[in-house]
A protein has these predicted regions:
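SAM/dcSAM-binding transferase cores
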Residues: 89-132
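Glycine-rich loops and low-complexity Gly/Arg-rich segments
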Residues: 29-33, 78-81, 102-106, 119-120
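Generic, ordered loop/turn and secondary-structure boundary motif
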Residues: 12, 30-31, 83, 108, ...
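Conserved Class I SAM-dependent methyltransferase catalytic core
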Residues: 32-94
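Short, flexible active-site-adjacent loop segments at beta-strand->alpha-helix junctions, enriched
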Residues: 8-11, 59, 101
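Mobile active-site "lid"/loop adjacent to the S-adenosyl-L-methionine
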Residues: 2-4, 9-38
Length: 132
């Protein structure tokens, strides 16, 4: 068993949106209703008790992922919304779930990636120094 599993599951549903030019990109970005349960189940089988599963998805699929986590015995622990700019809708949601936990999830302060001049914000650089 491991303490941490990280993933970026394909969150777009097949048949929605514009398809990428390559098959590899299509597989990376598009899945079906069974994709999230597969990822959650695989993560759960790899994790030790109280291990963490962290993933990033589109906010419009949040309910689907929460249901998949519940079905795999993973409890959402932390949600954090990622915005392109402070005034724009969330582009992504970062989810941390724990195996066998019974805590209520908390919502962290949202992160805005870009400021007015399209440069990374200090908060986004603090969150991910690799953006420098």
């Amino acid at each position: 068993p491991v303490q941490l599993v990280m993933a970026t599951p394909p969150w777009r549903l097949v048949g929605s949106g514009r398809l990428p030019a390559t098959e590899a990109r299509r597989k990376a970005l598009f899945g079906d209703k069974g994709t999230f349960p597969l990822f959650a189940s695989a993560a759960s089988s790899l994790l030790e008790e109280d291990g963490r599963f962290v993933c990033i998805i589109s906010p419009d699929r949040l309910q689907d992922m929460l249901a998949a986590l519940d079905g795999a015995g993973l409890t959402p622990y932390l949600l954090q919304y990622i915005h392109k700019q402070k005034t724009s809708p969330a582009t992504f949601v970062l989810i941390e779930a724990r195996k066998g936990a019974h805590a209520k999830p908390s919502v962290a302060e949202p992160i805005a990636l870009y400021g007015q001049e399209r440069f990374f914000t200090l908060e986004s650089l603090a969150f991910c120094p690799f953006l420098r």
